[in-house]
Amino acid sequence: MGDLGFLQWEDPYEWTETNHAARNHAIRYENRIFKHIAHASGSERELQKEKHAYMAAYGRMNTMKPIRIPQDNPHILISPRLQVEGVYYWKHVRDPKWKYADDLDFWSVQDAPYVAYTQDVVVGKLDYTLHVKTPTSHWTHKKNGGDAVAIMNHRVYFIEGDEPLQYNRLVSLSLYTGQQRKVIYEEKNPSIVISLVKQENRTLFLIGEDAGYQRLWWITPTGSIKRLDADGVSFKPVGCSKDDRPVYFVRQGDFTKPWTLVGHGWKLNREIERSGIDFCSMTQNVLISRHQGVRTVWNMSTTSEPKRLHSGFFTPLPFTDWPFWRGESVTTAPIWVRGPSRPPYKFLVAKSEIYVDSEKTRPYAEETRGESMSPDGLRVGWLLLTSAKSQRKPRRLMVAAYGAYGTSTNLDTTRWIPWLDAGWAVALAFVRGGGDSNESWAELGRMSGKLFAVGDFEACIKDLQRRTDCGPEHTCIFGRSAGGLLIGNLLSKYPTGDLFHCVYAEAPYVDLLKTASNPALPLTEYEYKEFANPRKGPAEFEQALRMSPIHSLPAGGAPGVHVLCRSGKNDIQVYPYEALKWILTLRGNREDTSKILHVNSQYHSTYGAEMYLEYAEDFLIINNWLK
């Protein structure tokens, strides 16, 4: 039973939370059903064929040459990895063995290399250990924390946490010994998340975020901390000026205000002032803005208006910042990006001109950009991908969306390459709530605006069906994590298959009411202003109830829709009992093998060989359902 003091409600599947033995028994039963459906959907030979297709697709993405640090006389090599355990692999130039890292930084003392790096205790657990490899030894910090690490003036900066996902204490330590620990800042408010931001010429910032509303601190070269622009609500740190002042963009007062650039003299235009900002470099005079998923590269100047150099669907890759942070060969450093239709590529900006080096990476998809009108009159962007190998019209349609936390839609479509090759169209809907435009766009999708984001998604699906001639019987929708609120609410609205015939879900957030009512869970208090706080009173309880997919389903479940759902047993972001509750509710108290769930032993994401196998199984099952 849910009990908030002022209100109680019955939860028929509460046992999935409290009775571990019963839950584990139910999960084993669901896993057996899932494997039976998977085996019936294709032979072992077909399964292995699709698994190898996924391995080949991801292999094509990991073709980047190792990065040399320093560039001219390298001490270490770094190999960025995509969609594998860890984000990077690194090693000393004379060391045959590569180590994985989630983040790392490099410092040279008298031409001797020091490398600070973080590693997840178990891949996917989100509980990171700080390591420092010195020329003669290795030390490990006793406290775990977040994944980011930075070195500045012989000190290592790291955010500690007492529990995974609750990182709240910025500390610095001696680079050489790991001793002399100093607490730089500790966040006491449980709803605020803090994170390190490394910018140009080793300028270090700390950002605190509370449902999109931000605070910015500058970590000075001496290791002190200074709050910047207390009236600012949104920030984009840039670096440090020639007179050693912090440079940053700020929106003052509210999200509708234009960007102001503090500490530097670039001229801005209205488009930049209103857009989100992904990247900027004072040395290269480059800025990358975003709107409705589209990024624009600008050449910036202190004397003339910004010059538009390039636009398209792409996002800068994390390691693009490295040469700018280190201040090494910044004027010629490439900007690495990835798009939704080709492997990662780079571009170079020099003398207000751009060279896009994408000719060597052949596209695997054709891109079509469009907009849909949401029921409240708001225009919502989308991107449609079709196979570059075939001119035939697509036979089936997959539509994916996320729309939460101000996080940009993932443009990595590697997982969809086998689907495109099989004649599917794959679409991304840039619904409100996400970070595909500016901060106002994200704010429009928070709290009660989440249901408007569902309307955005619905409008995009209908227009994409008209564009592709793929009706509901050939349409599948995909949502992961907080994207589960979108697909779950649409499924509650169309349980008989009138809009789509299939739902594909990974770690879906579908029991918002119960999760948001439990402050003991690691993310609950962070999310009160993103979704709702049912404990606050009847108004927000009703809001959470309306947005919670499990509670908005009709009594008969969803008899007209196939659902494939995956979760991880050790997931602490979206606990696996949410997916189990949802599947049981979708069946409407009847035997129904068109709703299936598999729970593996991993965390919020699946990695390695198991990921390829799961993707292959899902591909065969859904293609069998949507013949």
Which residues does each predicted region cover?
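Conserved blade-register residue in beta-propeller folds
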Residues: 89-90, 132, 172, 218, ...
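A conserved hydrophobic secondary-structure block that centers on an alpha-helix together
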Residues: 96-153
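Polar, glycine-rich mid-to-C-terminal structural blocks
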Residues: 175, 179-187, 192-199, 203-206
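Active-site-proximal cap/loop segments of hydrolase catalytic domains
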Residues: 431-627
